[in-house]
Amino acid sequence: MDPQGIVKAFPKRKKSHADLSSKALAKIPKREVGEARGWLSSLRAHIMPAGIGRARAELFEKQIIHHGGQVCSAQAPGVTHIVVDEDMDYERALRLLRLPQLPPGAQLVKSTWLSLCLQEGRLTDTEGFSLPMPKRSLDEPQPSKSGQDASAPGTQRDLPRTTLSLSPPHTRAVSPPPTAEKPSRTQAQLSSEDETSDGEGPQVSSADLQALITGHYPTPPEEDGGPDPAPEALDKWVCAQPSSQKATNYNLHITEKLEVLAKAYSVQGDKWRALGYAKAINALKSFHKPVSSYQEACSIPGIGKRMAEKVMEILESGHLRKLDHISDSVPVLELFSNIWGAGTKTAQMWYHQGFRNLEDLQSLGSLTAQQAIGLKHYDDFLDRMPREEAAEIEQTVRISAQAFNPGLLCVACGSYRRGKMTCGDVDVLITHPDGRSHRGIFSCLLDSLRQQGFLTDDLVSQEENGQQQKYLGVCRLPGPGKRHRRLDIIVVPYCEFACALLYFTGSAHFNRSMRALAKTKGMSLSEHALSAAVVRNSQGVKVGPGQVLPTPTEKDVFKHLGLPYREPAERDW
């Protein structure tokens, strides 16, 4: 999305029901701990942050304690209420809590119930706020007296949504689709990795990953089958498909509005909603024709009932009302989060400190050295450079490196190697085929580039990553009108060159798909190596390193994974 697009998307924000709880909270008089009221003394609650957000969850916890209640874990004896986001579903809540069923006497309630209690100053009835149980679970004993009523059609009350939120007010949105509607999601327990990890992360299943990228959940493997996916199953993986075969987006008029919301939740740090929207967006982009009905939307893997309602609202009215209720903070948070070195948490901190524009931040804000550089070159960093400029930057680094040793290999990776016409930054990978001569080149090269005036600012002078050395900085080509550009220089041993080349070429989606596929084969893929016979625990976390496989070229990585080789231009997912 255009960095300025979200600012244009939210010129004004209408009052929403979510504002009511903020006003209600403002009316609650501050008291000393010893003076805390006891009207929540019978409440022993656990607040689940997923969807609610950590900052808002902590605010809930403070108010519970302030009014005499107790905060505990979901597994604690005597827990009475487990408070979840109002768009959470029953099975997903249990899965995130890692509970086979609710503890005896506990109720699973929506956060709007707690907001209403705090607004009215009393414990209100949970009817209409309890999460409905899946039909197959109704024969199991459940402590919530309203569970069956809530699951019956038409019995939930349509109450005003009230939320207890920090400034900026937390906006309501659709969560990732309920797993009860997609049985195949529960079959895959293998997890994909975060882009910056070593390839081991238990948060997102490979099934979720494929739906996120292609809109299609994988076919569950046969119970007696081997670990290797069948050829037809491989076709479902992004890494097995050329990006040139991306499906035509027949639902652009829907996805462009959902993308605005996804971006809004992302800059607010609400990763669960952002992920839910991302999965739905990619599912819609991959659908083979324009969506025309609610039933058709519900039939698409990755689209839940609530998301289908949003799709129909856009189809029927050409608009999505949620866009009118996004917090005023969103364009400011995006403005701040575009500063290099500032993530969503830092952007939120600056917003809460009262900053609303870059000028105020520059004159009054407390910035790290890296953030100050990012702010100084704010416009240059956001401006994508033409491919020809990226080639000049690579050539400058290569000439300087080969002046020390002509045998050094220097390759520009990222979007440049994938053949894109514009690039956000330049990543130059350096190695030597003899496996030794790359040593010592790192510092000499940086000194040379600084003396030439090519490097203007250092963001991270040296980042050690195993045997790899990485420099993150700013460069500028000589000549009038040249802009400052982001440049990363990575020196790697030749034994890791192929995996590093694959990793730094990307795209990020393609890499995640490769690593998730490796996991299904009992392997582990990172920027350092491809390993086989990797030992993992029941949660999918790697507990044994396995055996490093020989990968002299990228083609060997694909071959070990049973994939056809994809040229860099075919990896642009």
Swiss-Prot record:
Similarity comment: Belongs to the DNA polymerase type-X family.
Q: Which residues bind Mn(2+)?
A: D425, D427, D488
Q: Which residues bind dCTP?
A: R384, S415, Y416, R417, R418, G424, D425, V426, D427, N511
Please list the cofactors this protein needs.
Mn(2+)
State the compartments where it is located.
Answer: Nucleus
> Record's SUPFAM superfamilies?
BRCT domain, DNA polymerase beta, N-terminal domain-like, Nucleotidyltransferase, PsbU/PolX domain-like
InterPro entries listed in its UniProt record: BRCT_dom, BRCT_dom_sf, DNA-dir_DNA_pol_X, DNA_pol-X_BS, DNA_pol_b-like_N, DNA_pol_B_palm_palm, DNA_pol_lambd_fingers_domain, DNA_pol_lamdba_lyase_dom_sf
| Name of the protein in question | DNA polymerase lambda
Catalytic residues?
K310
Keywords recorded for this protein, A-Z: DNA damage, DNA repair, DNA replication, DNA synthesis, DNA-binding, DNA-directed DNA polymerase, Lyase, Manganese, Metal-binding, Nucleotidyltransferase, Nucleus, Transferase
Per the database entry, which stretches of residues form a coiled coil?
none
Any GO CC annotation of this UniProt entry: site of double-strand break
Q: What does this protein do?
A: DNA polymerase that functions in several pathways of DNA repair. Involved in base excision repair (BER) responsible for repair of lesions that give rise to abasic (AP) sites in DNA. Also contributes to DNA double-strand break repair by non-homologous end joining and homologous recombination. Has both template-dependent and template-independent (terminal transferase) DNA polymerase activities. Also has a 5'-deoxyribose-5-phosphate lyase (dRP lyase) activity.
Catalytic activity, reaction form: DNA(n) + a 2'-deoxyribonucleoside 5'-triphosphate = DNA(n+1) + diphosphate
Q: Per the database record, which ranges form the BRCT domain?
A: 35-131
Fetch the Pfam families from UniProt: DNA_pol_B_palm, DNA_pol_B_thumb, DNA_pol_lambd_f, HHH_8
CDD domains (alphabetical): BRCT_polymerase_lambda, NT_POLXc
Q: What's a BP term from Gene Ontology annotated to this protein?
A: double-strand break repair via nonhomologous end joining
> Predominant location of this chain?
nucleus
